[in-house]
From Swiss-Prot:
<dbReference type="GO" id="GO:0005524">
    <property type="term" value="F:ATP binding"/>
</dbReference>
<feature type="binding site">
    <location>
        <begin position="75"/>
        <end position="78"/>
    </location>
    <ligand>
        <name>GTP</name>
    </ligand>
</feature>
<protein>
    <recommendedName>
        <fullName>Nucleotide-binding protein ROP_69550</fullName>
    </recommendedName>
</protein>
<dbReference type="InterPro" id="IPR053931">
    <property type="entry name" value="RapZ_C"/>
</dbReference>
<keyword id="KW-0547">Nucleotide-binding</keyword>
<keyword id="KW-0067">ATP-binding</keyword>
<keyword id="KW-0342">GTP-binding</keyword>
<dbReference type="InterPro" id="IPR027417">
    <property type="entry name" value="P-loop_NTPase"/>
</dbReference>
<dbReference type="GO" id="GO:0005525">
    <property type="term" value="F:GTP binding"/>
</dbReference>
<comment type="function">
    <text>Displays ATPase and GTPase activities.</text>
</comment>
<feature type="binding site">
    <location>
        <begin position="24"/>
        <end position="31"/>
    </location>
    <ligand>
        <name>ATP</name>
    </ligand>
</feature>
<dbReference type="Pfam" id="PF03668">
    <property type="entry name" value="RapZ-like_N"/>
</dbReference>
<dbReference type="Pfam" id="PF22740">
    <property type="entry name" value="PapZ_C"/>
</dbReference>
<dbReference type="InterPro" id="IPR053930">
    <property type="entry name" value="RapZ-like_N"/>
</dbReference>
<comment type="similarity">
    <text>Belongs to the RapZ-like family.</text>
</comment>
<dbReference type="InterPro" id="IPR005337">
    <property type="entry name" value="RapZ-like"/>
</dbReference>
């Protein structure tokens, strides 16, 4: 008993804040990495001077709304960045943070092509004079050699598309919750207009309308009687199965391209009976996929 009491009086263990330093070669995908980390729930500070990193970590730890994950993107755009971050990492060792370094790399050939495609000069190319792009890349690569050697993870983006880089970053710095896809199944009535935010729209007006059955008319598609009536109609279950298969293919493709949010609109005439029942049934099928976070919204329910 005394031992249990002593344990309960101990202060709760505070989980160290995750701190990620993101750096690498210009044109290797630093901005893409920043956007992915933001989508994963990281607080991202872009191009922060190295001298301010330690102070920002302190402020993040002292804040009432303490950050759990902080990422700082730093590159040669900062005039104070000499490529030596050893002293910054040493300062962070005394703080309750779990520090990692991500370095993005790419081949000279790919970097030259990327800069030429966007028609921008390299930050170290001396103003973009002709013949200095390769020199700028070489100078930056030499300047960042120590950082690359100290990195916890080096990703070469030479042969990676944006969605492939996203996947690598998600695998390394995401968690199970943030890797799930957010799917909204929204019922609606066509007479009130199409949902503006829908990625896909399906029309279930081919099913008999419960509105014309007096005992069902007052109820909605959420009631057992209306639901059973709608789902028992010829073609209803086949339609759900076929559309679910189509969504499986679509969701797989969306995931591959890095899309993390999706809205599926299911419409009938007034958004009260058929679309509500079919939305609930479709969401139930989608909800069996552990990689999806599914919610149902009935946009026009109660408008009549």
């Amino acid at each position: 008993m005394n031992e249990q009491h002593a344990q309960s009086d101990r202060p709760p263990t505070v989980r160290p804040m995750d701190f990620l330093l993101v750096t690498g070669l210009s044109g290797a995908g630093l901005q893409t990495a920043a956007k992915v980390l933001e989508d994963l729930g990281w607080y991202v500070a872009d191009n922060l001077p190295p001298e301010l990193i330690s102070r920002m970590v302190d402020l993040s730890l002292e804040s009432d709304s303490r950050l759990e994950r902080l990422a700082v993107v730093i590159d040669v755009r900062s005039r104070l960045f000499t490529g030596d971050l050893g002293w910054v990492l040493t300062e962070l060792e005394s703080k309750p943070v779990h520090t990692r370094v991500l370095y993005l790399d790419a081949s000279d050939e790919v970097l030259v092509r990327r800069f030429e495609q966007v028609r921008r000069s390299h930050p170290l190319s001396g103003g973009g004079a002709e013949g200095t792009l390769s020199e700028g890349i070489a100078a930056e690569r030499d300047q960042l050699a120590k950082v690359k050697a100290a990195a916890d993870l080096v990703i070469d983006t030479s042969s990676l598309a944006a969605h492939q880089l996203r996947q690598k970053i998600e695998d390394a710095f995401g968690d199970a919750e943030n890797r799930t896809m957010q799917v909204t199944v929204q019922s609606f009535g066509f007479k009130y207009g199409l949902p503006m935010d829908a990625d896909l729209v399906c029309d279930v007006r081919f099913l008999p309308n419960p509105h014309w059955i007096p005992e069902l008319r007052p109820h909605t598609g959420q009631s057992a009687d209306v639901r059973d009536y709608v789902l028992s109609q010829d073609g209803a279950e086949d339609y759900l199965a076929t559309y679910h298969h189509l969504l499986d293919l679509t969701i797989t493709g969306y995931r591959r391209e890095g899309k993390r949010y999706m809205t599926i609109a299911v419409g009938c005439t007034g958004g009260k009976h058929r679309s509500v029942a079919m939305s609930e049934a479709l969401a139930g099928r989608l909800g069996k996929d552990s990689g999806l976070n599914v919610r149902v919204v009935h946009r026009d329910l109660g408008r009549e």
